[in-house]
From Swiss-Prot:
This is NADH-quinone oxidoreductase subunit H 1. It comes from Nitrosospira multiformis (strain ATCC 25196 / NCIMB 11849 / C 71). It holds the Pfam family NADHdh. It comes from the Bacteria. Its main location: membrane.
């Protein structure tokens, strides 16, 4: 694609690939979890169970679209849409390859952080509008967790911004031509990855929807495609965090021999596999442990990383 390609062509193609990738991620995750846990994963619908995602989609689409009579109807319907829209908007600034991307913003990092922080409204509104105690508790947990870890995520990115000298994600990729930022920003990478898992509400940080405490958390009362939108938002979210890690710390599309698009997709897929492995390997912490870890460990580490990066940049300058 060149610079004259209409933006809507880029938009449609990226959305199609993103939804297909997120859908396949569901199948890949379940197959890998089955492999690592020494059991069968999906293996009945289609070869190797690959059509299980189609069966799940049909099941969700044919379920009754039920709204509890005690719920706040308008907000209840709006909440699932917010999580999907904000995640997709955050993905708009991710540069997939030269000439491939929805929009090239000079404030791409800030736009990503802004859209990511708006996702908490979906969870809080969904829990509140359900007018039920378990969704409300899940929404309150999500508000504290996501707002807290948004701080650490932003601080982790500032080291990368200081090294690249720009908030533009394409400039950040170009700045890694000689050295990927995963080496000088190893502390930033670690804190951003942990904060990203917490922001995406994935195991082991899925406290807002922990089944053994809150039934299903903030989406307990949801069914049909409203539940499906939360599900899609979660998988698109983990794809977004993986793509941002690749862009910020692993050189984006940069690499030898293979085309830039192939490098970007390969790196993103490897990061996603690492996140799935974390889900299989780590237990869920208590909620107080999660918050304590954030403010007593993550915050000091990000501040130390910021100070060290600033000192290096000033000394070189």
């Amino acid at each position: 694609m060149n610079e004259w390609t209409p933006i809507w062509v880029n938009l449609i193609l990226i959305l199609a690939v993103l939804f297909a990738f997120a859908a396949m991620l569901s199948w890949i995750e379940r197959r890998l979890l089955g492999l690592w846990q020494d059991r069968y994963g999906p293996n009945r619908v289609g070869p190797f169970g690959v059509l299980q995602i189609v069966a799940d989609s049909i099941k969700l689409l044919t379920k009754e679209d039920w709204i509890p009579p005690f719920a706040d109807r308008a907000v209840f319907v709006l909440a699932p849409a917010i999580v999907a829209v904000t995640t997709l908007l955050a993905f708009a600034v991710v540069p997939i390859a030269p000439g491939i991307g929805v929009v090239d913003l000079n404030i791409g990092v800030l736009f990503f952080l802004a859209m990511s922080s708006l996702g908490v409204y979906s969870i809080v509104l969904g829990g509140w509008a359900s007018n039920s105690k378990y969704p409300l508790l899940g929404g309150l947990r999500a508000a504290a967790q996501m707002l807290s870890y948004e701080v650490f995520m932003g601080l982790a990115l500032m080291g990368v911004v200081m090294l690249a000298g720009s908030f533009n994600l394409r400039d950040i990729v170009a700045a890694q031509e000689n050295l990927w930022f995963c080496i000088p920003q190893i502390l930033g990478l670690a804190t951003f990855a942990v904060a990203g898992i917490a922001e995406a509400r994935r195991l082991p940080f899925d406290l807002p929807e922990s089944e053994n405490e809150l039934v299903a958390g903030f989406h307990t009362e949801y069914s049909s495609m409203k539940f499906g939108l939360f599900f899609i938002g979660e998988y698109v979210g983990i794809t977004l965090i993986s793509a941002m890690i690749v862009t910020l710390f692993f050189g984006g599309w940069l690499g030898p021999v293979l085309p830039p698009l192939a490098w970007f997709l390969l790196k993103t897929f490897i990061v996603i596999i690492c996140f799935v492995l974390l889900r299989a390997a780590l237990p869920r912490p208590r909620y107080d442990q999660l918050m304590t870890y954030g403010w007593k460990v993550m915050l000091p580490v990000t501040l130390v990383n910021l100070l060290l990066t600033g000192a290096v940049v000033l000394s070189v300058a």
